[in-house]
């Protein structure tokens, strides 16, 4: 393996970091905007509170609110994104603190707007939408649906103030990135450093079993030392969610969270149920193939991320990735390729691994500015899939920003991972077409399973099942502790993986690794999105002109429900057919892996 040490942020190459000057040229400009929006917030409250009584006033209020929200959105990203890459920088922390002050002012003074919209007469709203804002039809439909769950203006203001305060997620991030210190470990006579970033991106997928397992032992030893702190943070978070659900009249915290993300309980339950029964057998076969080829008799959870063919890894530089992505995603059209070029030319992506940087990857798009992407580049080809994934988010929300107003700039969470996962499948299909070598083909398919499907349909799905069971325990007032959380996680893992592996000691603490548990019911949306993404990518593979249909869907933002968006894309998720087809596709890929491996072993 390649030994790696994390370096301080000030030692990374600037050309591979994201450019915050796309938002504000200087900190002084940022601070001036903070002062300006503070005044604008107070003026908005003074001008419109209690006065949304006629269509003309409501129209000007909505437009002004959208202007404020767009600037607030820029401010939030200028504050939060540097924290994700350099959280030990005092200036970065100070800028975040300044934004948190404005966030409190925003929440305390503008909560009236949502409350007064909900209180408007339904016919008044319909006439307003028809005559003034037909583009916000679905937005106001959701407003009407919220009526029975909306509290008094005073209560909503208290909740808004409370929600604006730094919460349990902040505590989780501090514990994870600032307090945890990992012991180095020895393997094969060498000493290796360990950290969250190093384990997640390097050691956990090392092809040397001794390195991999010693790293896991070191990693989980540290997690175990903080399990009670992390459990307290997480349990407090879900108790807060249960409290809000009860206040708003929901019997189940799951229904409350689904409503908040424009979700559908039937689709949610089907996703949770079907993947356990139908996908698990395919994944077990894949893991057994890994064990067979690596001659591992006691396959463990810590071994799941190894490559099927460890001697066949494709190296990839950051600069080379640009050409690959333009060719692979070129099927999506000229505008898509232009966006890829822009993302490199204008430094949308933060590539380096450094001390104080968050783990994982994400894309945070500021409409009409940039899709800021966080990665931890490892120099391997599989990072191209990660970047393709995040560029899918970037194009989606840049397109939404171009075609929709700020109130339609969101996206139903059930659909949000479709554009990103679709890109991963498109890249795989491109690679399979351009290189027919048997060993390369096996590498691509193996990567599809281990990166695209295992990550999105297994890792995040197991998070979702765990969440589902914990939330149901909260609904039933059952006691939760660190040990209870760990037992539930272990039970979920053992049920899914069956006899294909042993859940090694410490792996039950996997619930401490992901931030998604502080984001409502986000984890299940990965498998939901990949269900849609698989269908769309294969449609485009069969008929490249279908890309135009897909790009049109990506311009709709939150102006439609997830069901309607998927239907417009030609993938009707109101039935279980797309999910069943996606699972069958995974089974087909596993069959291909067995066939190709047997052919290569002859």
Can you say where each PLM-predicted feature lies in the sequence?
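Post-HExxH zinc-binding segment in Zn-dependent metallohydrolases
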Residues: 411-440, 449-451, 455, 529
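Active-site-proximal, well-structured secondary-structure segments within enzyme catalytic domains
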Residues: 132-136, 184-198, 228, 232-376, ...
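His/Asp/Glu-rich acidic catalytic environments and adjacent acidic regulatory segments
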Residues: 1-50, 74-262, 270, 274, ...
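Glycine- and acidic
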Residues: 20, 204-219, 256-272, 304-313, ...
């Amino acid at each position: 393996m390649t030994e790696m040490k994390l370096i301080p942020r000030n030692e990374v190459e600037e050309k591979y970091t994201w450019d915050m000057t796309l938002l504000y040229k200087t900190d002084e400009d940022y601070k001036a905007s903070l002062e300006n929006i503070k005044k604008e917030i107070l003026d908005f409250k003074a001008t419109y509170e209690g006065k949304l009584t006629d269509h003309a006033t409501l129209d000007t209020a909505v437009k002004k609110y959208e202007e404020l929200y767009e600037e607030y959105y820029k401010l939030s990203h200028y504050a939060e994104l540097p924290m994700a890459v350099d959280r030990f920088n005092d200036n970065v922390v100070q800028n975040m603190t300044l934004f948190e002050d404005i966030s409190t002012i925003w929440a305390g003074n503008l909560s009236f707007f949502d409350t007064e919209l909900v209180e408007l007469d339904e016919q008044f709203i319909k006439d307003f939408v028809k005559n003034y804002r037909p583009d916000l039809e679905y937005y106001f439909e959701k407003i009407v649906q919220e009526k029975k769950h909306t509290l008094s203006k005073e209560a909503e203001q208290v909740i808004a103030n409370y929600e604006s305060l730094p919460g349990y997620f902040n505590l989780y991030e501090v514990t994870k990135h600032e307090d945890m210190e990992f012991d180095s470990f020895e393997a094969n006579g060498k000493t290796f450093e360990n950290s969250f970033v190093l384990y997640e991106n390097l050691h956990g997928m090392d092809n040397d079993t001794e390195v991999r397992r010693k790293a896991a032992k070191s990693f989980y030893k540290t997690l175990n030392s903080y399990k009670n702190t992390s459990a307290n943070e997480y349990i407090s978070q879900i108790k807060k969610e249960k409290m809000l659900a009860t206040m708003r009249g929901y019997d189940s915290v799951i229904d409350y969270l689904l409503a908040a993300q424009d979700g559908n309980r039937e689709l949610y339950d089907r996703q949770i149920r079907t993947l356990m029964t139908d996908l698990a057998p395919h994944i077990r076969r894949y893991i057994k193939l890994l064990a067979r080829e690596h001659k591992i008799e006691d396959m463990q959870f810590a071994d799941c991320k190894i490559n099927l063919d460890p001697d066949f890894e494709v190296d990839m530089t950051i600069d080379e990735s640009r050409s690959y992505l333009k060719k692979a995603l070129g099927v999506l059209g000229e505008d898509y390729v232009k966006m890829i070029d822009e993302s490199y030319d204008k430094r949308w992506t933060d590539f380096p691994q450094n001390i104080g940087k968050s783990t994982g990857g994400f894309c945070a798009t500021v409409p009409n500015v940039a899709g800021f992407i966080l990665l931890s580049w490892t120099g391997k080809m599989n990072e191209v899939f990660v970047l393709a994934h995040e560029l899918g988010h970037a194009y989606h929300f840049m397109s939404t920003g171009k075609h929709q107003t700020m109130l339609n700039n969101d996206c139903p969470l059930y659909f949000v991972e479709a554009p990103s996962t679709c890109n991963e499948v498109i890249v795989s299909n491109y690679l399979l077409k351009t290189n027919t070598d048997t060993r390369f083909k096996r590498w691509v398919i193996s990567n599809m399973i281990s990166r695209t499907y295992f990550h999105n349909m297994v890792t995040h799905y197991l998070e979702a099942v765990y969440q589902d069971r914990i939330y149901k325990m909260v609904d039933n007032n059952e006691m939760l502790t660190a040990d209870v959380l760990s037992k539930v996680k272990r039970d979920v893992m053992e049920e899914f993986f069956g006899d294909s592996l042993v859940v090694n000691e410490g792996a039950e603490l996997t619930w401490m690794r992901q931030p998604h548990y502080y984001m409502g019911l986000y984890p299940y949306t990965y498998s939901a999105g990949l269900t849609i993404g698989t269908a769309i990518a294969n449609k485009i593979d069969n008929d490249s002109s279908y890309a135009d249909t897909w790009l049109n869907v990506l311009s709709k933002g939150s102006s439609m429900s997830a069901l309607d968006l998927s239907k417009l894309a030609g993938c009707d998720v109101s039935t279980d057919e797309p999910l069943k087809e996606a699972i069958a596709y995974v089974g087909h890929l596993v069959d291909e892996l067995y066939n190709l491996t047997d052919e290569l072993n002859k």
